[in-house]
Amino acid sequence: MLKQSKVSWVRGFVNIPNLFLQNENGKIVGVKENAIRTHIPTLKFIQAKKALGDRVKFILSLKIPFELYTDTVPKVGTKEMEYIFQATEVLLKTYDMAKNIEILVMGNEPEWENALDTDLCHADGEDYRAFLNEFANRLTAWKQANGWTFDIYAGALNRVSELPKSETVPAVVSVVNNNPNVVGLDLHVHALKINQAEDDFRIIRDKYGVTKKLICTEFSMVRALNPHVADALGEWGTKHGYTAGMKIYEYLNLIAEKANAGTPVSATEFKSLFESYSWYPKNWYKTFYEVFKKYDTYAITGRFSVVPGGARAVYDAKTEMWELGGIYFSRYLG
């Protein structure tokens, strides 16, 4: 499917601490080098790149959630910090990862992963700033030593417009603005209201003065969809051969079964269900697209396809509707 599409960017995502670091009593105590070198998703990522060739560029996002550890962000120069860098370097050398990526993103939504309290305002901002600066400098040294050419981005900041008091956001932005080794900033825009598609970009450019490149490796309206997963089909259901009391998640389970059996519902029916609800953000993909163009977004990645037998085999009233953000809906429409 990727070969037949016009996709130009593919993003990979790896959680460094969960997969590749040893953790004892809230401390990073070592690196699982064998786990890195035998990590099957890494191999598949590289195989996909080689199959697609130069036509498609790959992005690697490194998730480093410090909230897993009691001391949040380790100090630069400590053994804990060095283990993080060691694991990253081994990963980049495994299967020639570094030679096959165009962009490396340091971090993933650090507002959530570096918070000291539940209001997401207070964080170990200065230590996180120091970490990112050191990380960018280490990556640059490795690039020079190994002939690697990927660009370094910081991020990925999420809900910037909703967290005006965050200590993490200005820390990340300062690294982007002041470290010459950092090419740009990654934004994740998971909007609750459609106007928020632009809010984060505008604030980053206007309030924080970021002039470097922007990319967006995640975007969705999942937060607008989740509260309605158990809504009834209502009059639409009656008109289309279902019961008025059937829930959206029940409908999704049913049409997934139909698609799997080779008798999928039509795309017209599928689309008309959501457009029958006043809460549904109509044309949200188009809205995001216009925002990306307006802010000259260098690279955008999102959910490409929803395939049968995905991570959420059966939906229920608590299922988060990430899969409704795909471009193709093989799971629902065959």
Mark where each language-model region is.
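Aromatic- and acid-rich polysaccharide-binding/catalytic face
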Residues: 10-14, 58-64, 91, 98-102, ...
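A short, Lys/Arg-enriched amphipathic alpha-helix followed by its capping loop at the start of a domain
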Residues: 2-7, 291
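Substrate-binding cleft/loops of secretory-pathway carbohydrate-active enzymes
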Residues: 156-186, 196, 200, 225-234, ...
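Substrate-binding cleft of secreted/luminal carbohydrate-active enzymes
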Residues: 192, 219-334
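Alpha-helical scaffolding within the catalytic cores
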Residues: 1, 37-46, 86-92, 158-175, ...
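Surface-exposed cleft-lining segments at the edges of enzyme active sites
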Residues: 114-124, 184-192, 271-276
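Aromatic-lined carbohydrate-recognition surfaces of secreted/lumenal glycan-active proteins
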Residues: 103-108, 129-170, 182-187, 212-223, ...
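Substrate-binding cleft and catalytic face of glycoside hydrolase catalytic domains
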Residues: 5-159
